[in-house]
Amino acid sequence: MDWNRIEGNWKQFKGSAKEKWAKLTDDDLKLIEGRREQLEGRLQERYGKAKDQVRQDVDDWLKTLH
């Protein structure tokens, strides 16, 4: 999945993001607005993971999207 597609259609994908990362709040999802760096930053804050691990988690999530 190309990130540009997610960014342009964030409303379609944010539900999937919320399912994957339940600690993300609705305000987080609104703030992210499809920007990968915002998503990764929020995931680091909410889950206390290292940047590299969060990046891998997001890459893995992308592979599940169609």
UniProtKB/Swiss-Prot annotation:
SUPFAM superfamilies: Hypothetical protein YjbJ (SSF69047). InterPro entries: CsbD (IPR008462), UPF0337_stress_rsp (IPR050423), YjbJ (IPR026042), YjbJ_sf (IPR036629). This is UPF0337 protein bsl1473. Transmembrane segments: none annotated. Belongs to the UPF0337 (CsbD) family.
